[in-house]
Design a protein with these regions (language model features):
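Phosphate/NTP-binding elements of NTP-utilizing enzymes
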Residues: 1-178
């Protein structure tokens, strides 16, 4: 399967006017694409597409029919930025990501899928992943959604243990907390 660079594909859509985004998103992708072209950033398509494939093959909707997720182009581009843009030693350049998404557009589901990838396949032993929000109740929504998501996938569920204060993955010594 050939690797795609969804960052360029998304940026091309923005540049051509086929995809409408705000000023800050346009500037961000201009910066990223320029950085890739000038060698400021290194793009590892294998890492980016590994994250995308994981999300689309192991992460389920938690309500309704519980189908597997199918990421939209902007989500694939965002995941590519998060996991595919790396330093020469392979560490991620963007370690913190701020994404603004309108109401009822899948923020919780997308965040849960990214958490799932980081917890199960990112390769960081002893990771501590926190669901943060202005209120604990909001953080618990993402945490609970993540838990429901992994319960739908036996391969992930078998590796996980729900404890009183977290979800623990013994194989990687990883804990996910609200």
């Amino acid at each position: 399967m050939p690797f795609s660079n969804y960052i360029y594909e998304y940026y091309d859509g923005i540049s051509s006017g086929n995809i409408t985004v705000g000023k800050w998103v346009r500037l961000l992708y201009e910066y990223i694409v320029k950085g890739l072209q000038e060698g400021l950033f290194t793009f590892n398509a294998k890492k980016a597409n590994k994250a995308i494939r994981f999300i689309e093959n192991f992460c389920h909707h938690c309500e309704g029919r519980t189908d597997l997720l199918k990421l939209e182009l902007w989500q694939k581009a965002a995941v590519s930025v998060m996991f595919g843009i790396v330093e020469e030693d392979g560490t991620r350049v963007f370690r913190e990501v701020f994404i603004v998404i309108g109401r009822k557009n899948g923020k919780t589901l997308f965040a849960s899928a990214v958490i799932a990838y980081m917890a199960y396949l990112d390769g960081e032993y002893g990771a501590k992943i926190y669901c943060l929000a202005p209120k604990l109740e909001q953080a618990n929504i993402v945490y609970d959604n993540f838990y429901q998501m992994i319960k739908k996938e036996p391969e992930l569920s078998d590796l996980s243990k729900k404890r009183r204060s977290d979800i623990y993955i013994e194989e990687s010594n990883t804990a996910i907390k609200p």
